[in-house]
Structures are given as structure tokens and as C-alpha cells.
Swiss-Prot record:
Protein family per UniProt: Belongs to the MukE family.
Subunit structure: Interacts, and probably forms a ternary complex, with MukF and MukB. The complex formation is stimulated by calcium or magnesium.
Compartment(s) where it occurs, according to its Swiss-Prot or TrEMBL record: Cytoplasm, Nucleoid
Keyword RNA-binding in annotation: no
Protein name: Chromosome partition protein MukE
GO CC annotation, single: cytoplasm
Gene: mukE
Domain of life according to the entry: Bacteria
Biased composition (Acidic residues): 212-225
Length: 225
């Protein structure tokens, strides 16, 4: 075993970080110690995770995550269609001027309103109830499902709740996993809007996954004071 890899595995940060990565979490610049650790040992950890048929990826935006191959030895589950749509909306909000105006903080209501503005409400309601009639009860269920999706994406490191107030959150650069492919000269925000409105499917390699075994037991570490 290379000396640097042995040092990485012996580091006290590694056990919790390894568990987080395997559960599908993205490690961005906000997690200073973990991110610096991955930067220092990236080359050696890439070889380590390759043994499990997963790739340690550093995205252009700087965050890290594990991308499973078809033969992965790490349990996984694919996010739901609504989870993916909420992720696309989060990416759109990240690109919006409002993010700077609001110091990067959004509310769950703002997320829900943007979702209804950009996506087809009838299709969204069908995701909750295939026999939806557009009733107030169906809309209430949709809002509850959106909250659940946001919480699931928090576990993936896409958002940080503000302290103990889960109604407010800050979006991280990891939402670019849901970003549109932007051609040269294109406006990224407009490209993201088209992705949402056209219902364009994301490439298979970009499908986000979460380890079901840890989803319910993951501590609420993604909070800010």
C-alpha cells in the first residue's frame, strides 16, 4: 500500500468522510477540512475507491463525489423524478441574481413558487398522485413531497439549512450536478430554464444516487448556526 494512501486511511477525518461519500454526499468548499483532505489525497483515494468500482470525481466547480459504475460494490438508489426536478430548480436559483441579493439564502416557499412557475403543475401533481384532479389536497401533498425532496438533497450536500430553521437554506455549488449543458455563448440561467421547461432528461451518468441504508439515519450535520 502506498505510504500516502496509508496516511489517508489512518487520518481521523477518513471514517466519517468515507461514510458520507458512500452515502452519496457531495463535499464542497464549505466543508473546509474534508475538502482540503480530499484535495491532498485525491490521487491515492481515486485508486482506493476504484477497487469498489466507483470513481472519486472532482467536478469543475470544485466539489467531490463518488460516481458508481454499473458493477459498483456500494449499495445505491436513484433519486425520484421529483427529487431531480427540485434539484434543477435549485440550480436555477443558484444562477439567479436573487442569490446575491439575498446573501445566498432562500426559503422553501420561494423554491415551491419557482417550481410552479417553471414546471408544468399538472405533471408535478401526477408525480404525487397519478389520479390527481388538481385539488387543494393534491397541492398540499405536492408541497410536502417537495419538502421531502429538499431534505433528501440536503443529505447529498446540495443545500445547508440555516441553523434549526429548515424553512430557510443556502444552496451549494453541488447543484451543478443538475445543471444544463451550456454551449459557448449561451446564458447559463436561460439554458437551465429550458432544461426545466422542456422536461429534458439528464444523462445517465449524471443520475444522482443515495445509499438507502443511511438516508434515514444520517445526522442533521448539514446545518449552519
Amino acid at each position: 500500500m502506498p505510504v500516502k494512501l496509508a496516511q489517508a486511511l489512518a487520518n481521523p477525518l477518513f471514517p466519517a468522510l468515507d461514510s458520507a461519500l458512500r452515502s452519496g454526499r457531495h463535499i464542497g468548499l464549505d466543508e473546509l477540512d474534508n475538502h482540503a483532505f480530499l484535495m491532498d489525497f485525491q490521487e491515492y483515494l481515486e485508486e482506493f475507491y476504484a477497487r469498489y468500482n466507483v470513481e472519486l470525481i472532482r467536478a469543475p466547480e470544485g466539489f467531490f463525489y463518488l460516481r458508481p459504475r454499473s458493477t459498483t460494490l456500494i449499495p445505491r438508489s436513484v433519486l425520484s423524478e421529483l427529487d431531480m426536478m427540485v434539484g434543477k430548480i435549485l440550480c436555477y436559483l443558484y444562477l439567479s441574481p436573487e442569490r446575491l441579493a439575498n446573501e445566498g439564502i432562500f426559503t422553501q416557499q420561494e423554491l415551491y413558487d419557482e417550481l410552479l412557475t417553471l414546471a408544468d403543475e399538472a405533471k408535478l401533481l401526477k408525480l404525487v398522485n397519478n389520479r390527481s384532479t388538481g385539488s387543494d389536497i393534491d397541492r398540499q401533498k405536492l408541497q410536502e413531497k417537495v419538502r421531502s425532496s429538499l431534505n433528501r438533497l440536503r443529505r447529498l450536500g446540495m443545500v445547508w439549512f440555516m441553523g434549526h430553521d429548515s424553512s430557510k437554506f443556502r444552496i451549494t455549488e453541488s447543484v451543478f450536478r443538475f445543471g444544463a449543458d451550456v454551449r459557448a455563448g449561451d446564458d447559463p440561467r436561460e439554458a437551465q430554464r429550458r432544461l426545466i421547461r422542456d422536461g429534458e432528461a439528464m444523462p445517465i451518468e449524471n443520475h444522482l444516487q443515495l445509499n438507502d441504508e443511511t438516508e434515514e439515519n444520517q445526522p442533521d450535520s448539514g446545518e449552519e448556526e
